[in-house]
A protein has these predicted regions:
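Nucleotide 5′-phosphate-binding alpha/beta core
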Residues: 1-125
């Protein structure tokens, strides 16, 4: 598998790509996940305050205990899902219990893993344990 465009960017270009993705993800979460909006509003952080990956440290941390409480108060995801529940492919539960929604295409996730392995220098015939 050949490397994608992102894997061949300069460090500056890659950081700019990451920063754009971070801005987009935070903006989307703020406008579509009530729990994210509430947590950000509570600490006075708006999406415009998050311009780079380094700015993520401004966001409040959600502890496991807080997540469990939020999921009990607003089942099953505690206000953290940003897409319609009908678009979820599966829901995993972990001990705790914590519900983890999954929406993406498993083949797209596999392609990301393959690209990572290619970037690390693995090729056809290599054995990975």
């Amino acid at each position: 598998m050949s490397l994608g465009k992102a894997e061949t960017l300069s460090l500056l270009e890659r950081q700019q790509l990451i920063d754009r993705a971070v801005r987009g993800a935070v903006e989307h979460a703020y406008h579509h996940a009530p729990a994210v909006r509430e947590k950000m509003d509570r600490v006075g952080v708006s999406p415009s305050d998050i311009q780079t990956a380094r700015d993520l440290e401004k966001l409040p941390v959600t502890t496991k205990d807080e997540l469990v409480s939020l999921q009990k108060a607003n089942p099953p995801f505690g206000g953290f899902v940003t897409i319609p529940v009908s678009k979820l492919r599966k829901i995993c539960t972990s001990p705790g219990p914590i519900f983890e929604p999954e929406a993406g295409d498993p083949l797209e996730r596999a392609a990301v893993v393959v690209k990572g392995l290619a970037a690390a220098g693995f090729t056809a015939g290599d054995i990975i344990l």
